[in-house]
Amino acid sequence: MKQHLSHTPGPIGVFDSGYGGLTILDKIREVLPEYDYIYLGDNARARYGTFEVVYEFTRQAVNKLFDMGCHLVILACNTASAKALRSIQMNDLPGIDPARRVLGVIRPTVECVGEISKNQHIGVLATAGTIKSESYPLEIHKLFPEIQVSGTACPMW
């Protein structure tokens, strides 16, 4: 059964630090074709580094998408989802507009893990920042405590 978002005026914003989020945007559009979308890819500053840098660049992108009329922004970037999402949700959104939303990709990805794991072992290939955050193992073990998780940082991502 297809779930619909509550009334979301304006387009849905999708952000990534590069082009990878376009695959996520395509899937979102398949599931929710009735919405308009704005994609923001920050190729100029790709390969974000420290928490502070990831948070600041992600916050800037979210604010830009809000300024463009989006009331929902999806962080299609694992690094931004791992390192900046919670801070933006807890610290920034209440001061901007509590009715707006920012969502990440880690939790929805993890919800699919049980369906795809045939041997109770999942490998995660991601940026060093995403691997160091341990966001995937933490979320996977909340839903699937029996699944073993191995993470490998890919330095060129």
Task: Please provide the spans of the model-predicted regions.
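Non-catalytic structural scaffold of enzyme domains
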Residues: 1-157
